[in-house]
């Protein structure tokens, strides 16, 4: 279904607290549309974003009635966490002949309106999207941006409604949602087997990425991370001759190589694209890759559009050095009595490994206390041995019951305890609390000055920071 955005006034979002859906709602709200929505009563970081944007929403998604609301809507946008006609509000919309589109379908419609840049990958797409939006915005290019988390440099928002024809969006591979998107430029950060409840094997996931590459508009630009072997394999399978492919990375085989990488205080310093001694405020090397991807995309955009930025090098270096971070991405929540409190969204074994090892390397003399909540039964079961291996790296580990997705109907208790017992065999400093709040007093008794405490996962254990 094609959307005529000029004819829309009122838009209603079902599942408005989802990260992407919230960003889209804020984006369209800033563009002047009347936006409302509904979701569950559980609290997420998106509650604050919606409140900051003065967007009204209801918290009774399973009982909510559009008819009782007494307002007419031109479009219903729903989260993929729900079936298209799986809720009363969606059934009512169908009965009332109100157009119903998924979040990813609306994102796809927007991509056809603009010069669009899509960012995809199993890991790092949120951060890369934020970096790209930040660069374009700070350099005066007035972009439109939709990213899956709140960005401090966006004023703690997850969207920018600019006045240019540039549209930058994080796009997701789950259920092949990104195939709705039609980019002029595509950035791929990496590929890892993930979303095992949908992709039956790695080959199915790889095929989805190849399909997405074929969505590039004529003479489109593809940017890949050549440090990722899976992306190099995909590169060899691309048949379209009109696509312009550029690679970046820390290895010699990349078209554009990152060099002179050193850690200095709170910064990773590196050289890239002729810019020497760029200082990026981050504790993780993979953010150097993410920033470099964004910087290369910016450079290619400027070249292909005949644009230039006054004092480009100094401006980019200032942006990198002053980068303030993203919600739930190695976020420093607070420092209290000599303890650093952090929060991170890592929920796949590779993300957990890279984040934990990066933190341990950066904070060499600190004791790392990890509070982890596994996310989805299917992911935990599929990567069970990998989880056991990577989680045992923490100096002290606190585990909780698996946080199920809306699509799952399993009892998580047995698998959660099994994970705990298997890790305990490797790391005796492993503890289990089924419910998050039950661990508060125990964690308080553990923490001493000099520790680093980090909550990790896609569940709700981040609430611990409110009690510590």
From Swiss-Prot:
Pfam families in the record: Mur_ligase, Mur_ligase_C, Mur_ligase_M
Any one Gene Ontology cellular component term annotated for this protein: cytoplasm
Recorded GO MF terms: ATP binding; UDP-N-acetylmuramate-L-alanine ligase activity
Record SUPFAM superfamilies: MurCD N-terminal domain, MurD-like peptide ligases, catalytic domain, MurD-like peptide ligases, peptide-binding domain
Listed EC numbers: 6.3.2.8
Residues reported to bind ATP: 121-127
Keyword Transmembrane helix found: no
Keyword Cell cycle attributed: yes
Localization: Cytoplasm
Main localization of the protein described in the UniProt heading: cytoplasm
Alphabetic keyword roster: ATP-binding, Cell cycle, Cell division, Cell shape, Cell wall biogenesis/degradation, Cytoplasm, Ligase, Nucleotide-binding, Peptidoglycan synthesis
InterPro entries: Mur-like_cat_sf (IPR036565), Mur_ligase_C (IPR004101), Mur_ligase_C_dom_sf (IPR036615), Mur_ligase_cen (IPR013221), Mur_ligase_N (IPR000713), MurCDEF_pg_biosynth (IPR050061), UDP-N-AcMur_Ala_ligase_MurC (IPR005758)
Catalytic class of the enzyme: ligase
Pathway: Cell wall biogenesis; peptidoglycan biosynthesis
PANTHER family linked to this entry: UDP-N-ACETYLMURAMATE--L-ALANINE LIGASE, UDP-N-ACETYLMURAMATE--L-ALANINE LIGASE-RELATED
Similarity annotation: Belongs to the MurCDEF family.
HAMAP family in the record: MurC
UniProt-recorded name of the protein: UDP-N-acetylmuramate--L-alanine ligase
Source organism of this protein record: Borreliella afzelii (strain PKo) (Borrelia afzelii)
